[in-house]
Regions:
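Conserved catalytic motifs of ABC-family nucleotide-binding domains
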Residues: 186
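ABC ATPase nucleotide-binding domains
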Residues: 265-291
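Catalytic Walker B motif of ABC-type/P-loop ATPase nucleotide-binding domains
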Residues: 190-194
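Conserved ABC transporter NBD signature motif
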Residues: 87-95, 104
C-alpha cells in the first residue's frame, strides 16, 4: 500500500443501496456482481459481489482497495467488456454491456495500466487515434480531428510534447499523452485503471488534480481504480471501498475513511485526520501492539 500525501466533498450508504438518487445521474451501477468458473468441473468463484453506486456528470468516483480485491473487475463491468452475473450498469439509461463496440468506443474511454504502441508514433498522432477508437485501419483525419487532438494535449499540459516520439517520453509524460488520447474521444465516461502507477509523487498529485479540473470543466464522469488512499481522499467525490470482492462502503471520503475499517481492509495500523483542505488524510503508524 502506498501512502501518498497530496498538498494542501454525506450520509453513509450500505453496499446494497444506491449512493445517490437524482435525475442528473449519468452512471448507475445497480447490484452488479460477477463470477467465473476456472473449469467445467468447479463451481463459479465470485470475484465481485453485489455492488451499487451512482455518479453524475462532473464527478470522480474512486474504486479503492488492496490488490486482488475486484477493483479491475468492477471497472470492466462498468466499461461493458464483461457482462454481469447479476445486476446492471447503465450509462445514460443504456446497459453498457449491450452497447455495440462502436457506440461503446464513442461513449466510454478507458485508460489501462499499460498501453502498448502498435507502431511508432509522435504524441499528437497517438492522441489522434482517439478520434476513431473503433476504427481498425488508418485514415485521413480532418482538420477538426487534428484540432481536437491538439486541444486534448493542451488540456493535460502536454502541448509541448506533440511532436515528440512516444518512445522518447518519460513515464509521466507518456501517461499525460495516454490521457489526452482518451479525452480526444470526447466521451461521456472516462475510466482509468491505476493511472498513477509508475509515477513519482509529484506526478501523481499533478495527474489527479488535472483530472479534477477536467471532470468539472468538461462534465466528464470519471471512475478511477486506485490503492492510493490519500489521492482518492483528496480528489474523489465518492469512494467505493472493496475488499476480496465485497463492497464494504460507498460514500464521500469523509464517510468511508473510518480508521477501523481502513485498517481491516489494508491490514496496516493507520491514523486518519483532516488535512488542510478539510478532507481526510491517512498515515501509517507504528503497530499498536508493538509487533
Amino acid at each position: 500500500m502506498s501512502m501518498v500525501a497530496p498538498p494542501a466533498v454525506g450520509a453513509m450508504r450500505s453496499p446494497g443501496e444506491v449512493s445517490r438518487v437524482n435525475n442528473d445521474v449519468r452512471l448507475s451501477v445497480e447490484q452488479v456482481s460477477y463470477a467465473y468458473s476456472p473449469n467445467l468441473t468447479q463451481a463459479p468463484l465470485f470475484t465481485l459481489e453485489a455492488t451499487s453506486f451512482q455518479a453524475r456528470a462532473g464527478e470522480i468516483v474512486a474504486i479503492l482497495g488492496p490488490n486482488a480485491s475486484g477493483k479491475s473487475t468492477l471497472l470492466k463491468l462498468i466499461a461493458g467488456t464483461l457482462e454481469p452475473l447479476s445486476g446492471k450498469v447503465l450509462l445514460n439509461g443504456f446497459p453498457t454491456h449491450s452497447l455495440t463496440a462502436r457506440t461503446r468506443a464513442q461513449r466510454i474511454a478507458m485508460v489501462q495500466q499499460e498501453s502498448q504502441l502498435l507502431f511508432p508514433a509522435r504524441a499528437w498522432e497517438f492522441v489522434l487515434q482517439g478520434r476513431h477508437p473503433h476504427g481498425r485501419t488508418l485514415r485521413f483525419e480532418s482538420a477538426t480531428d487534428i484540432a481536437v487532438a491538439r486541444n486534448a494535449l493542451a488540456q493535460v499540459g502536454a502541448a509541448q510534447l506533440g511532436d515528440r516520439w512516444m518512445a522518447e517520453l518519460s513515464g509521466g509524460e507518456k501517461q499525460r499523452v495516454i490521457l489526452a488520447r482518451a479525452l480526444a474521444q470526447q466521451p461521456l465516461l472516462l475510466l482509468l485503471d491505476e493511472p498513477t502507477l509508475h509515477l513519482d509523487i509529484a506526478a501523481q498529485v499533478d495527474l489527479l488534480l488535472g483530472l479534477r479540473h477536467l471532470a468539472v470543466e468538461n462534465r466528464y464522469t470519471v471512475v478511477v481504480v486506485t490503492h492510493e488512499l490519500n489521492l482518492a481522499g483528496e480528489y474523489a467525490d465518492q469512494v467505493v471501498l472493496i475488499q476480496r470482492g465485497k463492497c464494504l462502503r460507498v460514500g464521500p471520503p469523509g464517510v468511508v475513511y473510518q480508521r477501523e475499517l481502513l485498517e481491516q481492509v489494508f491490514q496496516t495500523a493507520l491514523s486518519v485526520e483532516l488535512g488542510p483542505s478539510g478532507r481526510p488524510r491517512v498515515n501509517v503508524v507504528a503497530d499498536r501492539e508493538g509487533r
